[in-house]
Amino acid sequence: MIVLDTNVVSESMRPRPDASVRAWMDAQIPSELHTTAINEAELRIGVALLPKGNRRKDLLLAINTALARHFADRIVAFDSAAAVALADIVEHRRTIGRPISQFDAQIAAICKARGATLATRNVADFADIGLKLINPWSAP
């Protein structure tokens, strides 16, 4: 299982996604690509905070379409196993002097609880957690 972080999902929705990201995604088995409910929330919050108008409506439609088309049954929820992992991640990152944002900690916890790889551009944000990370912008 590969979990796509918000920046990867967002990039894939662009009219002209980065060539490296597109090539990396095309090389993956679609059924292995997932995202989380936390990533969905980040996307929806980003749109909800935009001024009302056509751009906001168009982006919301694009998110709804992308999630339904590409992740219909592959949006991973935050569950009890993730809650246990979350506590460990937050404690560890504070102990080493590198606090982590709540959303990133929740995404990392979901991945850790399921043994999933995380695909993200922000690899530094998820360092020192013990996750396998892939940066599609620089993947071979």
Located regions from the model:
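Acidic, PIN/NYN-like endoribonuclease modules and their adjacent C-terminal/linker elements
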Residues: 1, 106-140
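Short, well-structured N-terminal submotif of metal-dependent ribonuclease cores
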Residues: 1-36, 48-66, 140
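Active-site phosphate/pyrophosphate-handling residues
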Residues: 7, 20, 84, 106, ...
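A generic structural signal for short hydrophobic patches within well-formed alpha-helices
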Residues: 9, 40-43, 83, 126
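Residues that scaffold the ATP/ADP-binding catalytic core of kinase and kinase-like folds
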Residues: 11-12, 24, 46, 86-89, ...
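Short, structured coil segments at secondary-structure junctions
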Residues: 29, 71, 129-130
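Residues at the C-termini of beta-strands that transition into short coil/loop
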Residues: 37-39, 79, 137-140
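Active-site neighborhoods of divalent-metal-dependent phosphate/nucleic-acid chemistry enzymes
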Residues: 45-51, 69-119
